[in-house]
C-alpha cells in the first residue's frame, strides 16, 4: 500500500507541474502572439519608410548628384592622409616594435628597474628634498621580475602574440588584433640593444622628476591611443572596460569624454578613408533629435555656463551610441564588446565585496537610526552606492544570458562567477532601487526567454509567496528591514524623495513646455522657490522621468519615451524573428537591463553620473547593433518571403516547431 501511495503522490506532483507548464505555455504564446506580439512586430516597416525619406537620403549621401566626383575627393583625401609623414612614421615604428625580439624589451625593463631602484635610494638618502614614493620600488621590482622571462626568450613580439594563448586571447578577443594583422610582421628586427639602453635611461630620467607610475601610465595611454587610431572598435572596448576605474581619477567625466572623442576621431578618419561605413537609421534620427534637445537645454537654461558645459558633455557621451551602432557591425565585435563590459564588472563587483568585508565603508550613505544593523553601503570604484547599483543592473542580465547559452565548462564557471559577484555586490549596495531594478530585469528576462523559464519562474514564485510571512525568520534581519522600508514614510530617504517630487511637480507645472534646462545648477537655481521643507539641499529630482520632463519640457519626455518604445519594438521584433538563439538572448538581456534601469529611474535620477549616462546608451546601442547585425546576416542568407510592406512576418522557434504569424493592416493573425 505504501508503494501505491508513493506512486499516487508522484503522479499528483507530475500533474501539478504539467498543469503549471501548460499554463506557462499558454501564457507565453499569448504574450508572443497576442497584443504584445502585434505591438512589437512592426519596427522594420517603420525603418523602411524612414529609409525612403529625405532625411535618410541626405544623411546617407543619397542626394549627392556627382557621386563619382565625390568619390574622387574622398580617395584623394584618403591617399593624402595615408601617405602623410605622421602615418608613415607610425607604421615604421609599429613594424620595428612588432618585429623586435623580446629580449630587447627585457633589456629595457632590467636597466629601467635597476635605475629606478637607484633613484629611490638617491631621493631617500640625499638632500634633494623629494620624499620617495612607494611606487619607485614597486615599479622597479615589477620591471626586474618582468625582465627575467623576456631576457631568456628568442621570440619576437609578433611571435609571442601568435603563440601565447593568453597574449593571443587578449589581442584577438579584446582588441580585435587578428592573425592577419600579426602575420604582417614576420622578419626579426635585429638586436637593437643600444636603443633599449637609451630608452631605459630616458625613462629613468623622466621618472627622476615625475612619479614612475605616472610615466608608465603615460606610455600605456600613448600605446592605447595608437591602437585606437588603428582599430577604432578597440576604442569602444577600452572605454567600456576602463569606465568604472575612471572613478578613481580626479576627473572621471573629463577622462571619459576624452576617450570617446579619441575613438570618434579614429572612426571619422577611417570613414574618410572609406575603411568604415556610416548608416543613418530611424533610431539614429530619434537619438539625434533627443541629443539636440539636450544641447539646446544647455543653451536656453537657468543654469548659465555650467549647464552649457553639462549639455556638451551629454552630447559627446551620447555619441558613444553612434560609435557602437556603426563600429560594432558584426556579432564577433559585439561579443568582444560585451565581454569587455562584463569582465570589467567582475573586477568592480569583486572590489565591492572585498570593500564590504575588509574595508571600513562610509556609514553616511545609510540612516543608522533606522538601520543600525547595516554597517554601510559599498561604492566600489564609483563613490556612490546607487550609481554602482545602476551599473550592476545593466551588467547582470547580460551575464545571465551568456551563462544560459554557454556549453563549455570553463565558460560556465566564468559566467557563473560573474553572476554571483554582480548579484552579491548589488545586494551589498543596499540600494532598494537597485534591488527593484534587478528583480524587474530578471522577471522580464525569464518571462520572455522561453516558456520553460516561465514555468521555472512560476514554480519558484509559489513557495516564495507562501514563505513571505516567514521571510523575517529565514533571511537576515537587516535585509528584510531594508527591503520592507521601500514604501515606508519613516525612512529619511523616502521622506526626502516624497517632498522633493512634490516640489518638482510644481516646477514642471510652471515650466511645462520649455523646461528649465539641463544640469544641477539649473535645478538648484529654480528649486529654491519651490522647495518643500527639509529638501532645500536637493540638486536633482531623484527621478529620471521627472528630471527629463523638468529639464526639457513636454517635448523632451515624450521624445524619450518614444525612443524607449522604438527600442523595445526593434529588440523584440528581432528577438522573435532571429534564427540565432544567442543573438536573441543577448537582445533580450539588453532590453531587460534597460527595463531594470528604467524601473530604478522611477525613484532615482540615474543620469546624474555621466559614466552611467554613457553606459545606459551603450547598452541601448548594443541592442540596436545586435538587432542590425542579426537582421543583415539573415538578409544575406535568406530571400524575403514577400515584398508586401504592409505585412510583418514573425518567425519564432519553439520546441523544434516553427510558428509563423502574419500581422496584416487590420491587426488580424494568420497562424
Model-identified regions with their sequence ranges:
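Flexible juxtamembrane loops connecting transmembrane helices in multi-pass membrane enzymes
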Residues: 156-169, 372-378, 469-503, 509, ...
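Hydrophobic alpha-helical transmembrane segments
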Residues: 394-396, 553-565
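Membrane helix-loop boundary segments at the extracytoplasmic
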Residues: 121-129, 241, 245-249, 549-552, ...
Amino acid at each position: 500500500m505504501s508503494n501505491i501511495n508513493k506512486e499516487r503522490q508522484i503522479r499528483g506532483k507530475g500533474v501539478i507541474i504539467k498543469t503549471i507548464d501548460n499554463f506557462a505555455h499558454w501564457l507565453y504564446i499569448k504574450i508572443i502572439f497576442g497584443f504584445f506580439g502585434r505591438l512589437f512586430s512592426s519596427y522594420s516597416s517603420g525603418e523602411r519608410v524612414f529609409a525612403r525619406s529625405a532625411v535618410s537620403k541626405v544623411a546617407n549621401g543619397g542626394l549627392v548628384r556627382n557621386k563619382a566626383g565625390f568619390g574622387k575627393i574622398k580617395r584623394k583625401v584618403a591617399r593624402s592622409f595615408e601617405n602623410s609623414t605622421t602615418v608613415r612614421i607610425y607604421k615604421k615604428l609599429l613594424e620595428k616594435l612588432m618585429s623586435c625580439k623580446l629580449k630587447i624589451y627585457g633589456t629595457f625593463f632590467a636597466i629601467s628597474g635597476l635605475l629606478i631602484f637607484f633613484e629611490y635610494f638617491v631621493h631617500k638618502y640625499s638632500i634633494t628634498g623629494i620624499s620617495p614614493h612607494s611606487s619607485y620600488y614597486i615599479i622597479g621590482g615589477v620591471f626586474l621580475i618582468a625582465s627575467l622571462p623576456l631576457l631568456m626568450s628568442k621570440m619576437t613580439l609578433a611571435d609571442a602574440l601568435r603563440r601565447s594563448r593568453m597574449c593571443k586571447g587578449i589581442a584577438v578577443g579584446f582588441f580585435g588584433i587578428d592573425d592577419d594583422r600579426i602575420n604582417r610582421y614576420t622578419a626579426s628586427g635585429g638586436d637593437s640593444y643600444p636603443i633599449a639602453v637609451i630608452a631605459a635611461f630616458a625613462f629613468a630620467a623622466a621618472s627622476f622628476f615625475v612619479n614612475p607610475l605616472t610615466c608608465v601610465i603615460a606610455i600605456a595611454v600613448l600605446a592605447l591611443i595608437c591602437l585606437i587610431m588603428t582599430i577604432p572598435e578597440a576604442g569602444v572596448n577600452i572605454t567600456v572596460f576602463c569606465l568604472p576605474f575612471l572613478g578613481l581619477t580626479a576627473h572621471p567625466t573629463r577622462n571619459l569624454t576624452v576617450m570617446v572623442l579619441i575613438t570618434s576621431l579614429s572612426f571619422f578618419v577611417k570613414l574618410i578613408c572609406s575603411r568604415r561605413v556610416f548608416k543613418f537609421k530611424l533610431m539614429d534620427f530619434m537619438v539625434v533629435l533627443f541629443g539636440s534637445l539636450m544641447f539646446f537645454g544647455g543653451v536656453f537654461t537657468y543654469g548659465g555656463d555650467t549647464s552649457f558645459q553639462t549639455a556638451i558633455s551629454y552630447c559627446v557621451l551620447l555619441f558613444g551610441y553612434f560609435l557602437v551602432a556603426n563600429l560594432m557591425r558584426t556579432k564577433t565585435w559585439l561579443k568582444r564588446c560585451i565581454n569587455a563590459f562584463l569582465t570589467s564588472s567582475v573586477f568592480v563587483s569583486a572590489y565591492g565585496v572585498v570593500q564590504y568585508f575588509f574595508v571600513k565603508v562610509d556609514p553616511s550613505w545609510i540612516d543608522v537610526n533606522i538601520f543600525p544593523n547595516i554597517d554601510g553601503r559599498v561604492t566600489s570604484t564609483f563613490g556612490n552606492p546607487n550609481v554602482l547599483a545602476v551599473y550592476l543592473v545593466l551588467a547582470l542580465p547580460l551575464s545571465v544570458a551568456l551563462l544560459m547559452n554557454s556549453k563549455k565548462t570553463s565558460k560556465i564557471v566564468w559566467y557563473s562567477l560573474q553572476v554571483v559577484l554582480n548579484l552579491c555586490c548589488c545586494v551589498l549596495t543596499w540600494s532598494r532601487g537597485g534591488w527593484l531594478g534587478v528583480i524587474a530585469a530578471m522577471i522580464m528576462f525569464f518571462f520572455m526567454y522561453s516558456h520553460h523559464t516561465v514555468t521555472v519562474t512560476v514554480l519558484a514564485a509559489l513557495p516564495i509567496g507562501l514563505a513571505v510571512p516567514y521571510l523575517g525568520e529565514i533571511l537576515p534581519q537587516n535585509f528584510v528591514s531594508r527591503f520592507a522600508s521601500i514604501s515606508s514614510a519613516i525612512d529619511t530617504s523616502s521622506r526626502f524623495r516624497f517632498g522633493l517630487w512634490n516640489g518638482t511637480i510644481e516646477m514642471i507645472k510652471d515650466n511645462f513646455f520649455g523646461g528649465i534646462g539641463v544640469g544641477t545648477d539649473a535645478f538648484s537655481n529654480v528649486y529654491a522657490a519651490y522647495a518643500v521643507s527639509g529638501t532645500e539641499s536637493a540638486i536633482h529630482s531623484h527621478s529620471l522621468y521627472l528630471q527629463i520632463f523638468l529639464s526639457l519640457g513636454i517635448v523632451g519626455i515624450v521624445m524619450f519615451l518614444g525612443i524607449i518604445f522604438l527600442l523595445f519594438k526593434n529588440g523584440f521584433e528581432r528577438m522573435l524573428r532571429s534564427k540565432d538563439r544567442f543573438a536573441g538572448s543577448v537582445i533580450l538581456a539588453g532590453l531587460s537591463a534597460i527595463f531594470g534601469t528604467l524601473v530604478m529611474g522611477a525613484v532615482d535620477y540615474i543620469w546624474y553620473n555621466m559614466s552611467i549616462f554613457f553606459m545606459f546608451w551603450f547598452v541601448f546601442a548594443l541592442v540596436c547593433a545586435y538587432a542590425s547585425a542579426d537582421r543583415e546576416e539573415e538578409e544575406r542568407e535568406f530571400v524575403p518571403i514577400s515584398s508586401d510592406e504592409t505585412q510583418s512576418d514573425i518567425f519564432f522557434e519553439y520546441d523544434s516547431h516553427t510558428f509563423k504569424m502574419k500581422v496584416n493592416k487590420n491587426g488580424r493573425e494568420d497562424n
